[in-house]
A protein has these predicted regions:
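Secretory/organelle targeting and membrane-embedding segments
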Residues: 1-145, 149-498
Length: 498
């Protein structure tokens, strides 16, 4: 590539060392970063160029998989790193940033200039204005912004206005790393590349859909951030609703950035508005409590002792369109769950007449499709088959596919894929301004309800469990239970390894 420069705000922070630098090294290792390029780190911590390179080299040795580490390649990669000690919250440093860019690239508008905001959200509205004041919002520049993009609908609109005053929409890349995962993208391929499933992908054949994205860790030293966010802002408003869109969207006429993102927005705009019954009965929020050697949320550093921040959310959603009317989507996310997993489970309707006995008398009769996004990525279809021997009893069995069966093909790093897309100018997997606002518009009533009703239920659940019992009660209204994932896709109800 010609004269590429990347400027990372928050270059001494956790996101940079854990995700961005390993992703950039991965691109370098795969020869996706070639030719003349410079990566300039911006942060308040004081480093020289050499000190910063040494720091990043140490972090790469910790956060890059051992089988991908190459001493010579890593040394070559960090030789392209530079550092400018600067407070991005103060405008006076930006002329110095402009000059450093010119020193590195020979011009203020290199062929490909990428800004990455790996900063606290409080700086999201400040940095672009200071870039504009310094004349750095050049025609060849792009800017990547991490979630959360806004705190609610009003703040999201204000941020969109700010960015629109500095950059064109095609220069703004709002990143959601879930969409960078190969398995998330494969949901689209599974649906639209296979004629046997798409005709069944509607209200006539699907009973309900579950989407689970949970972690087996707590807030991991992020108490200050999490107190202002909670599970709904941190996960539901962006990650989970994106997975709803991938599951429910119509096929684009032509697969390109505009058409794909148009269909995502249509799903968001079709979400059935939440009424008072929904707010009271179809949303369950929880907070993990101490269990065994695991702390409760209120015992975490940076958390108020009487905090009412949600670490678990379960919701029942509806989509008011021709394809999905009447099909509930149950989504949930939580911290301190028994395992870390993200998966989509599609429950098909039962056959209209049951001809056969069910082996054991207690096996599910409906087919179930599981799309596992992480870990142990794969797909499972559960179908009924005759039990060998006399009689005609049917038992549920699995047809499964694992990405590991492809034979050493890596699933790829989500950040590497998305950064590469941004370098190439492909915004397909990034969130557009209208999608941000449509998502917040749907969830804003929930936030207002909690604000206006501070005593709205917040259920405790012991750390290491599947969440509040009340979330099971919500599923029971549909005559169903949550599918609690096992470590391996092929585990059964009789054996479930976590």
């Amino acid at each position: 590539m010609d004269n590429f420069a990347m400027i990372i705000f928050g270059a001494s922070g956790d996101l940079t060392k854990r995700k961005l630098m390993p992703a950039l090294y991965s691109l370098y290792r795969e020869k996706r970063l070639t030719g003349e390029y410079s990566i300039l780190g911006i942060g308040r911590t004081v480093y020289s160029d050499d000190n910063y390179r040494s720091y990043i080299l140490e972090e790469l040795q910790q956060f890059v998989k051992s089988e991908e580490q190459d001493t010579a390649l890593m040394a070559s990669f960090v030789s392209h790193l530079y550092y400018l000690p600067m407070d991005p919250a103060k405008e006076e440093g930006y002329p110095q940033l402009r000059q450093r860019l010119v020193d590195l690239t020979g011009e203020v508008d290199p062929d490909n200039l990428l800004f990455y905001l790996a900063t606290p959200p409080s700086l999201y509205g400040v940095v672009p204005l200071y870039l504009k004041a310094a004349g750095l919002n050049t025609p060849h520049s792009r800017i990547i912004v991490e979630k959360p993009f806004g705190y609610d609908l009003e703040s999201a609109r204000e941020l969109n206005k700010t960015y629109a005053s500095v950059f064109n929409e095609h220069q703004i890349y709002r990143i959601d790393h879930f969409l960078g995962k190969e398995t998330a993208q494969n949901v689209l391929a599974f649906r639209f590349a296979n004629g046997i499933f798409e005709p069944l992908w509607n209200r006539n054949y699907i009973d309900y859909v579950e989407i689970t994205a949970v972690e087996n860790l707590g807030i991991e030293q992020r108490g200050g951030f999490y107190e202002t966010a909670g599970a709904l802002r941190d996960m539901v408003q962006n990650h989970l609703i994106q997975l709803v869109a991938l599951t429910a969207m119509e096929p684009p006429a032509v697969f390109n950035a505009d058409n794909f993102r148009n269909e995502v927005v249509k799903v968001y705009e079709s979400l059935t508005p939440l009424n008072e019954v929904d707010l009271n009965e179809h949303i369950v929020r929880g907070q993990y409590t101490a269990s065994g050697n695991k702390k409760g949320y209120r015992e975490e550093k940076g958390v108020a002792p009487d905090s009412r921040t949600d670490t678990y959310i379960a919701m029942k959603l509806g989509i008011s369109n021709w394809r999905w009317s009447g099909v509930p989507f149950y989504i949930r996310t939580g911290k301190q769950m028994p395992t870390k997993v993200t998966e989509i489970v599609v429950h098909f309707r039962e056959t209209p007449h049951q001809m056969f006995h069910c082996a054991g008398g207690n096996c599910p009769r409906a087919n179930k499709l599981i799309l596992r996004l992480q870990p142990n990525e794969g797909i499972v279809l559960k179908i009924g088959m005759k039990v060998p021997g006399a009689g005609f009893e049917v038992r549920q069995v699995t047809m499964d596919f694992s990405y590991a069966q492809l034979g050493g093909v890596p699933s790829g790093d989500a950040y590497a894929r998305l950064i590469d897309d941004c370098i190439q100018g492909d915004p397909t997997l990034f969130t557009r301004s209208d999608a941000v606002e449509a998502s917040w518009k749907f969830f804003d009533p929930v936030l207002r309800y909690w604000k206006d009703n501070p005593d709205a239920p917040l259920y405790g659940y012991p750390a290491g469990t599947w969440g509040p019992l009340e979330s099971e009660a919500m599923m029971h209204e549909h005559g169903a239970d949550w599918t609690n994932p096992c470590k391996n896709l092929t585990n059964t109800d009789q054996y479930c390894e976590l």
